[in-house]
Amino acid sequence: MDSAITLWQFLLQLLQKPQNKHMICWTSNDGQFKLLQAEEVARLWGIRKNKPNMNYDKLSRALRYYYVKNIIKKVNGQKFVYKFVSYPEILNMDPMTVGRIEGDCESLNFSEVSSSSKDVENGGKDKPPQPGAKTSSRNDYIHSGLYSSFTLNSLNSSNVKLFKLIKTENPAEKLAEKKSPQEPTPSVIKFVTTPSKKPPVEPVAATISIGPSISPSSEETIQALETLVSPKLPSLEAPTSASNVMTAFATTPPISSIPPLQEPPRTPSPPLSSHPDIDTDIDSVASQPMELPENLSLEPKDQDSVLLEKDKVNNSSRSKKPKGLELAPTLVITSSDPSPLGILSPSLPTASLTPAFFSQTPIILTPSPLLSSIHFWSTLSPVAPLSPARLQGANTLFQFPSVLNSHGPFTLSGLDGPSTPGPFSPDLQKT
């Protein structure tokens, strides 16, 4: 037997032999046949092709190859029933001609084969069997190369992909547009706490409003202070006219609250000791807000101290420390007459226990929670009355650490109390 025979030729030979009617037979006159023993037919086909493992599943897959070539097609709704499309012309056709047609079809792609087979099956379902002339013309048109279902499917699939790409690009652009206006918003910074830093303006305005009550001898000094402080007013407060400031503070009582101010520097001089009223007023300023009666007149010698006080107010406004931690600078007393006590050292002579004597110690004027946690351990020392510095006099080289040598706050009396500051240590209380 010829091993080069094709499957459709093998089936046609079996149908033409009457001894094979128990395996395969014709069911109609239009080329329809049925495999009565499909497994036996498959076994014979395996023997012909030298494939002992051949079965009906492999045979049916091989028959699908001829669906594309429009040689054999499956009859729908009937099992093991097939039909020759060009029957009875195929009986008279030269096998070489059919082989050449098969060779032309083998050049097609496998994907075209599968898609065309589906089209043929669907066409068989919808349409009844056509006459042989129309079938042959349709077969020639398909194999002419002008028609290809594969190209149509590829074009349709490419269009779908293009639309999908466009759809995926649009959401990305929308997300980018939504994110772009939202990016600059976190960089906005609101400075809300800046208007609260205005305390240094009040003492300046208060000083200007009290000006008419001071004697004419100190008017020049106050004018000099106004020129020093006036450049700082625009940066601390919103622009207001000077007349509004004067009228706002003119109606208030002479008492004006001053944020943490240092004690005004003073030098011990005879006018301070000879005028106890002035000393009392200056000491009350250190412990309470500054109070200047209308009948108070400053002497020309105190004008220098007022200038130094205003300069230090300006310096304190520039400092960045909290209000509770601002300390007054330490002052050095330049007194010519030595003190008989000589508590500190020979290099620091002190005249008396006047308020100028206590101005060497830094003073915290504002109430602060730090005061309760600061202790003067030197004031609690019971050895202070028996110190060698007290017993040996002022010319000794031994220096005992006293409270005047330390830095810390001390309490001052109010306006109604005594004008002298409170005691520091047992030494000062006895003196």
UniProtKB/Swiss-Prot annotation:
Signal sequence extent: none
Keyword Cell cycle: no
InterPro entries assigned: Ets_dom (IPR000418), ETS_fam (IPR046328), WH-like_DNA-bd_sf (IPR036388), WH_DNA-bd_sf (IPR036390)
PROSITE patterns for this protein: ETS_DOMAIN_1, ETS_DOMAIN_2, ETS_DOMAIN_3
Composition skew (Pro residues), residue ranges: 261-273
Crosslink feature (Glycyl lysine isopeptide (Lys-Gly) (interchain with G-Cter in SUMO2)) location: K167
Gene3D superfamilies, A to Z: Winged helix-like DNA-binding domain superfamily/Winged helix DNA-binding domain
GO MF assignments: chromatin binding; DNA binding; DNA-binding transcription activator activity, RNA polymerase II-specific; DNA-binding transcription factor activity; DNA-binding transcription factor activity, RNA polymerase II-specific; RNA polymerase II cis-regulatory region sequence-specific DNA binding; sequence-specific double-stranded DNA binding
DNA-binding region(s), chain positions: 5-85
UniProt keyword list: Activator, DNA-binding, Isopeptide bond, Nucleus, Phosphoprotein, Repressor, Transcription, Transcription regulation, Ubl conjugation
Record has Signal as a keyword: no
Skewed-composition ranges (Basic and acidic residues): 118-128, 299-313
Spans annotated as Disordered: 114-139, 251-282, 294-323, 411-431
PTM sites of type Phosphoserine: S180
UniProt xrefs under PANTHER family: ETS, ETS DOMAIN-CONTAINING PROTEIN ELK-4
Family: Belongs to the ETS family.
Protein name per UniProt: ETS domain-containing protein Elk-4
Organism: Homo sapiens
Gene: ELK4
